[in-house]
Amino acid sequence: MTILFLTMVISYFSCMKAAPMKEASVRGHGSLAYPGLRTHGTLESLTGPNAGSRGLTSLADTFEHVIEELLDEDQDIQPSEENKDADLYTSRVMLSSQVPLEPPLLFLLEEYKNYLDAANMSMRVRRHSDPARRGELSVCDSTSEWVTAAEKKTAVDMSGATVTVLEKVPVPKGQLKQYFYETKCNPKGYTKEGCRGIDKRHWNSQCRTTQSYVRALTMDNKKRVGWRFIRIDTSCVCTLTIKRGR
């Protein structure tokens, strides 16, 4: 399992060909920025003759360092008072020259962590903790896929303004496409008429797609280009309302 996981990580970084996000003390629109690109500017300034001189840092020194960083359970990130939506930030954006073949790396790391936790259990406990053996089903059916900026076209940023999502991001050796890993309720699933396992005699239920903020290269109505937090579909949740008159 460990060898399989490392193989997936290597293939993941091989197709990504993009720089990671780094900490930046930017107020208002969050604290993450892609290195080598200015936070704000015009589209011409990003694709001009000097664009190639802004070198991008390497992805990571070693794969072990990346895994250790992302799986660090002792790292407790608290949202600031100025930005109370910090718990909605996700890592569902990738810059790549081709459609990613795997879910975001953090999803794979979470699965690997669950595997390590299960490896420490006894065989009997492991059998009983398997969701398939317990007959567990999701309350709402969902579907996840990578979508491009060309499919999204526009999005809503943190200030409530509608911005244009740029399809390509300029880098020293050309351009990379922006991909977004979106999760939404499955319209063809068995829960399109209501949530699974809900007592319909007492409750009205509905599976509803919810959104979170991700960082993306966008352009506002004044043609200003910059990295902003926008909303994308990230989950499918069950909403309940009690039936009246009972």
From Swiss-Prot:
GO cellular component: axon; cytoplasm; dendrite; extracellular space; nucleus; perinuclear region of cytoplasm; synaptic vesicle
UniProt-annotated glycosylation sites, renumbered to this chain: 120
Pfam (any one): NGF
Subcellular location: Secreted
Keywords tagged on the record: Cleavage on pair of basic residues, Disulfide bond, Glycoprotein, Growth factor, Secreted, Signal
Position of the signal peptide: 1-18
Keyword Methyltransferase: no
Primary localization class, coarse: secreted
Role, per record: Important signaling molecule that activates signaling cascades downstream of NTRK2. During development, promotes the survival and differentiation of selected neuronal populations of the peripheral and central nervous systems. Participates in axonal growth, pathfinding and in the modulation of dendritic growth and morphology. Major regulator of synaptic transmission and plasticity at adult synapses in many regions of the CNS.
Protein name in the entry: Neurotrophic factor BDNF precursor form
Lineage: Eukaryota, Metazoa, Chordata, Craniata, Vertebrata
